[in-house]
Amino acid sequence: MSDTGALQSQPVRPASGKPVFANILCAVDGTRKSFAAVEQAGILAGPEGHLTLLAVTAVTGSGAYRTAAISPARVEQVLERATQIAERLEVPSDAVVDPGAPAARVILERAREHDLLALGAPAASWLGSKLADGVTAAALKELAVPMLACRRLPPGEHSFAERILLASDCLEGSDELVGLTRRLAAAHGSSVILLHATDVESSTRPPRISEQVDALGDALKDAADVRIELDSPAEAIVQAADETDASLIVMGSRRHKGLRAIGSVSRRVVREAHCSVLLVAPAET
């Protein structure tokens, strides 16, 4: 099937009431994962939200040496397909073509004017979308707004955001991540699994975990939905997502701390997880 083939048929649960993310930028390049980003962003925004469908052609050179990442004819097809997805979900949208380059810089600058950036997730190998790879790498260094790296779920699995894996490092700022997840769960009727993974052995449970369990309330269906794992955080998150059939991972990206180890956790999870990943940077202090 071509990259513009039909998206899988999934139950769609639009946001109820005021969406958590109302103004979403979707970067589309014609790949199936970028169209999945439009669909998942539309589910988050709902009819009361708005999608900006952005195709960056990254035009360089002039005359015989003029090149573009996406041809004019291809851009029209890509945006028409993306608009059809938004219309099916009854989500208002605008289509925008930006000839600027490099594409990653253009997308990240435009994302600052939105609540969320949605795009196709990068491939686990080098055989992937250059757009997704470039934007993800840049965003992990300077994430200004939350970023949703999207993957299409296999048929028969939970629909998008139906089952959320929340990865909490229990550090300062993680309570805000819990609050965001609680709002998402309330808007979409989601169940939540709370995961704390650390490679440092301890005989005590992090005090903040108990507080976060209370904050999540009935989004946690039972005690088994709270997991404490002694393992590499990236490996634990990817494995827990597989074991629990999560359809969305929510986690932080601590680029403000300048810790390469933390950044690598985000990068590995975005590349290796089977489902979409919502990355949120801690607030500026």
Question: Which residues does each predicted region cover?
Answer:
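Structural beta-alpha unit
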Residues: M1-P19, A73, Q84-L117, A124, ...
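Extended, non-globular alpha-helical segments
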Residues: S2-S16, V135-P155
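Acidic (E/D-rich), amphipathic helical modules within compact regulatory domains
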Residues: A36, L44, H50-L51, R66-T67, ...
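Active-site phosphate/pyrophosphate- and oxyanion-stabilizing loops and adjacent acidic/basic residues
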Residues: E39, T83, R105, A137, ...
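A short acidic, glycine-rich active-site loop
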Residues: A69-Q77
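Short beta-strand elements of ligand-binding domains
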Residues: A118-A121, P146-L153, G252, V277-A281
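Glycine-rich, Arg-bearing micro-motifs that act as flexible, cationic patches
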Residues: L119-K141, A161, L248-E272, P282-T285
